[in-house]
Amino acid sequence: MRAERMSPLLALGLLVSGLCSRVHCLPENVTPEERHKGTSVDGHSLASSNTDFAFSLYKQLALKNPNKNVIFSPLSISIALAFLSLGARGPTVTEILEGLKFNLTETLEREIHQGFQHLLQMLSRPSNELQLSVGNTMFVQEQLKLLDKFREDALALYTSEAFSTNFKDPETAKSLINDYVKNKTRGKIVDLFKDLDPLTKVILVNYIYFKAQWRTPFDPKQTYKSQFHVSKNKTVEVPMMSIGDLVTPYFRDEELDCTLVELTYTSNDSALFILPDEGKMQDLEAKLIPEMLTRWRESLYPRGIHELNLPRFSIATDYKLKDILSQLEIKKVFTQEADLSGITDDHELEVSQVVHKAVLDVGEEGTEGAAATGVKVGITSINNHIPLSFNRPFLIAIVLKDTQSIIFLGKVTNPSQA
């Protein structure tokens, strides 16, 4: 009987690394106009669903990891699960796509995949202002034959490579996959998989590497040691970056008791830093919805900031998402009821785990050999008496401008913890 079998396993590995640094790199061949043109309404609809999924997943991760740093890439997870859904059928595919916050009564499944195809094409455009690598890869057990339709769609829609792998030798397979991942993320992600089950048949990997430079850099000489208030009873010493007389998008949200500042990169992408008032973090987290992000973006307006203080930090996280995704109603794919018959003729395939590893560095360090120039804008006609210090837990969202995709989302509770 099906209930008594030992299920062949499919694992998803999700990995992402990002660095936010200070060097102003001048474009050589690609103009901002060339990079940004082509964004469609469909792309914004996709971004809306991805944002809804991002906030839902964030709430679960924050709930499961109280008083800890939370950093993940909703974009990476969305792409990987959408990729997986290519091979899902029946209630399994419905759960995955609805869990990703798509309305299947309004949007055809094929249109969703075409939306991700367009998104990946946008992300793959070359730029001298931004280092961004996104890819999908399949590691397939030797002798296992993928269905032609799945292989073709995986390549056409998700530009996925496929590598034959001997999972019956789990140590060798693990080294192969981890080395591949390490190479694709410039050494930032190591040991994505700690161990592999010899019953594994397929591993789907999505990776994202992101590195950008601040449009207006921080001066390392201005970085100083300062106290960060992790909680009422705990403070830690952190390197605090500082910049004065800065003009940047700013918004004071009296309704949600928080302050926002947006720092842009030379690529016009941006990092949104959200500082709740003392004791208001949980209230803010409970109200995270896509409409709130839209309201924030519409309300941000350039203001003069007398002094901005932001901790320099490097945070790494490692999550197993099976239980958390189940809370978002993505369940069947992890059980013997999974229908992944669109991947292979082996109809007893199921997902064993979704592993996500993220690394995010925010600092003033630059790229070796690049030009290190940043331009400050004069603010004589703008109120420049606003001081802002991120010296207690705050939220961060890194948004790609041309697709409105959240590439990173998280909470910095303790910048001193790697």
Swiss-Prot record:
Subcellular locations according to the entry: Cytoplasmic vesicle, Secretory vesicle, Chromaffin granule; Secreted
Entry superkingdom: Eukaryota
GO molecular function, one term: serine-type endopeptidase inhibitor activity
Cited function: Serine protease inhibitor.
Protein name (database record): Serpin A3-8
Family (UniProt): Belongs to the serpin family.
Coiled-coil portions: none
SMART domains on file: SERPIN
GO CC annotations on file: chromaffin granule; cytoplasmic vesicle; extracellular space
Glycosylated residues in this chain: N103, N183, N233, N268
Signal peptide positions (record): 1-25
InterPro entries: Serpin_CS, Serpin_dom, Serpin_fam, Serpin_sf, Serpin_sf_1, Serpin_sf_2
